[in-house]
């Protein structure tokens, strides 16, 4: 087994070799919790959830840490607007974030540190940087990192200091020695949360927070650091500078994290998602209209490094495809019940290999689609199934569930999943499910009375509204086209 990942630091695909055999330490930058999470968060955290699932399925003991930033300028601004305590506001939105992640089927990290609970570690790390000459306190209560002291600054983002200096500036009130320098500690201001430090009361800057929490919960160096590609600069670039300067004499980026991975942006109908364009969607906006697993399935259809394009139409198509997968699993499990499954189907190992190759989820979904087509053909073949055919269907169902477990899909009983997906689709079309059930009962009575004209009229009337009836051994079910 060889797992290949695209490493942002080297801009190459590399074999993922943990520092300690059999164990992997992963840090993913979590959300700044000042509002409900948006589609960009959904895309990001589904990606890293699949990474964790696959690494564990491949036998690695993964320690997964993802933080909450609950001390930040945006949180303070939002809290002041609402007259709310900043930490309380952040806690409320952190709870909402958990609800959204649960709806998407994401596993919880092993550790979820919060900035507000790590102030002593942050202060100690800043003091270490001052002691080693990489940071300075100008005397106004702030502390800054001296960017030019770190020789590999910009290596991750492929930017040199000459390029950066053109866009750098000193804000009014800042006491930077160099426009490139960034804040590690900010002096207290009225109405803001503040903590004691050797430089006076204040609060941490954004970048130092993740460095401190990574070191506290994973040590240094770690194996893998991940997040959205918008974090490459300045956040991850600054994390490297801080963490390496505090812990290593070699001053190489690898002394903090051996591998860096980043996921692409979310676009809405081929435009960048933004509030100013009026195309900004929270996860809750989407989950009010679509099933959470359908959204997850949709997100997996684009390779994690590529930008992801969202549209209702394509999500609805993904929802239809997911329903078809569940229908096939239902048939395979029903027809293969009571027999010993046959050998593991070849598609399972092909799916593993695709995930080993930089977590190629679109390729996995293509492999799964081929396998499901074959299973459908076998399940729908007329006549009684032989013991061998039943064993093949049972093996397919077990393999489908195994691949689904790594992707975080196909984990529900088919009837439950199909009903949930159908009900969301019906609601979007203005279809009343209780009315459909009433008409199904009326149609059953008409058929029992041999009133086939009435039976056909009900079926055709529902079909005209996008409702397809399916008659089976257990009765009539329905779905929305």
UniProtKB/Swiss-Prot annotation:
For this protein, the parts annotated as crossing the membrane are none
Reaction(s) the record says it catalyses = tRNA(Cys) + L-cysteine + ATP = L-cysteinyl-tRNA(Cys) + AMP + diphosphate
Gene Ontology cellular-component terms listed = cytosol
Q: Matching SUPFAM superfamilies, A to Z?
A: Anticodon-binding domain of a subclass of class I aminoacyl-tRNA synthetases, Nucleotidylyl transferase
What is this enzyme's class at the first EC digit?
ligase
Where's it found, cell-wise?
Cytoplasm
Q: Where is this motif: 'HIGH' region?
A: 31-41
Cofactor section: Zn(2+)
The Gene Ontology terms for molecular function here are:
ATP binding; cysteine-tRNA ligase activity; zinc ion binding
> What is written in the cofactor note of this entry?
Binds 1 zinc ion per subunit.
Any matching Pfam family: CysS_C
Q: Cite the EC number.
A: 6.1.1.16
What's a BP term from Gene Ontology annotated to this protein? cysteinyl-tRNA aminoacylation
Q: Where is this motif: 'KMSKS' region?
A: 272-276
- Matching SMART domains, A to Z? DALR_2
Binding, ATP = 275
Q: Subunit arrangement? A: Monomer.
Name the family: Belongs to the class-I aminoacyl-tRNA synthetase family.
Q: Which NCBIfam families match?
A: cysS
Question: Which protein are we looking at?
Answer: Cysteine--tRNA ligase
What gene does the UniProt entry assign to this protein? Answer: cysS
